[in-house]
């Protein structure tokens, strides 16, 4: 069974590699985005996709307003189930860049969804990271106010 290297990585997650995919288990009470970012950095993943499920106790969503080109962030502190976390991996300024969205279920069976800024795991966290083995870069597009794929880089 493969494990992440170094004390920092071992505290955040464990994993098993199958082909070009990694099955990643994130440790309880770990911030999910930071753990996935550290994992991709450790493995040298330059592009790929991420999906997963689990449980969280805190969530910060981000919503983009295209008219103002500004983000509105909102934090929720309650137990929630991740029904879907999905996103992609690329790089920007030679750093890992994760673009993640999440849908969570609340105890009243309503749902929240949006761009994932951060989430603190409170229970299991099971993710699949696929490595595309190619570099995909991003660049800032001032017309959109967003970091978008740049296939020329």
Regions found by a protein language model. Name each.
Residues 1-9:
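Single conserved hydrophobic/aromatic residue that forms the stacking wall/gate
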Residues 10-99, 103-153:
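N-terminal intrinsically disordered, cationic/polar leader segments
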């Amino acid at each position: 069974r493969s494990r992440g290297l170094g004390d920092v990585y071992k505290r955040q997650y464990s994993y098993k590699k199958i082909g070009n995919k990694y099955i990643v288990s994130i440790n309880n009470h770990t911030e999910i985005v930071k753990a996935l970012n550290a994992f991709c950095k450790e493995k040298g993943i330059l592009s790929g996709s991420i999906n997963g499920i689990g449980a969280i106790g805190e969530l910060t969503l981000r919503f983009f307003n295209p008219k103002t080109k500004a983000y509105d962030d909102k934090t929720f502190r309650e137990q929630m189930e991740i029904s879907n976390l999905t996103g992609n991996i690329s790089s920007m300024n030679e750093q890992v860049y994760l673009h993640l969205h999440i849908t969570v279920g609340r105890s009243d069976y309503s749902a929240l969804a949006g761009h994932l800024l951060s989430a603190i795991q409170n229970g299991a966290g099971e993710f699949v990271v696929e490595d595309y083995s190619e570099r995909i870069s991003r660049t800032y597009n001032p017309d959109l106010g967003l970091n978008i794929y740049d296939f020329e880089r």
